[in-house]
Design a protein with these regions (language model features):
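Loop-to-transmembrane alpha-helix initiation sites
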Residues: 10, 68-69, 114-125
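Short, amphipathic, aromatic/basic-enriched membrane-interface segments that mark the entry/exit
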Residues: 66, 85-96
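Hydrophobic, membrane-facing alpha-helical anchors
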Residues: 14-21, 68-84
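Alpha-helical transmembrane segments and their membrane-interface exit regions
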Residues: 125-135
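Membrane-interface helix caps and helix-loop-helix hairpins in membrane proteins
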Residues: 27-30, 61-62, 87-91, 112-117
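Small-residue-rich segments of transmembrane alpha-helices in multi-pass membrane proteins
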Residues: 39-49, 72-75, 99-112
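Alpha-helical transmembrane segments of multipass membrane proteins
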Residues: 19, 23, 45, 49, ...
């Protein structure tokens, strides 16, 4: 079972990593910003921690799978992400924000189970995607920012 320090480290790392992604969304005035991304990741991290805790307590009494709760989180995030997507004038806005919410949920789950390298690398890749690929799209495809 995890000690208090491990639990705190996992929650704080979840906050920091998702905060970086949420800050980018906030700076660009998207529908879901800093607080939403942090809360979503923290909730996902807590759910994973709770799943691991339950598994540790009852592993000898019943067949349990900690991944089942995580799968429920990912399904639930789909509904939350759908709320960030707006159909407007024949176009769709908010897809990138919806995807970033899904990614921070995954980061929260990864930090919750101690999969730090994956969480860190995913955060780096997400930030590269959000910051730099925006400019690549403009240069290569003449695509203007549509998601507001």
């Amino acid at each position: 079972m995890l000690n208090d320090a491990e639990i705190i480290i996992r929650l704080v790392l979840s906050l920091v990593l998702s905060g970086l992604i949420g800050l980018e969304r906030q700076i660009h005035r998207r529908t879901a910003g800093l607080r939403t991304h942090i809360l979503l990741s923290l909730g996902s991290c807590l759910i994973m921690l709770t799943s691991l805790y339950i598994f540790a307590i009852y592993k000898n009494e019943a067949p349990l799978d900690p991944a089942r709760i995580a799968a429920g989180v990912i399904t639930g995030i789909g509904f939350l992400g759908a709320g960030a997507i707006i159909r407007d004038r024949g176009g769709v806005k908010g897809l990138t924000t919806a995807a970033s919410l899904w990614v921070v949920a995954g980061i929260g789950l990864a930090t919750g189970c101690g999969f730090y390298k994956a969480a860190l690398f995913t955060t780096a890749l997400a930030l590269i995607t959000l910051y730099f690929l925006r400019y690549v799209e403009r240069i290569m495809f003449g695509k203007e920012e549509q998601e507001k």
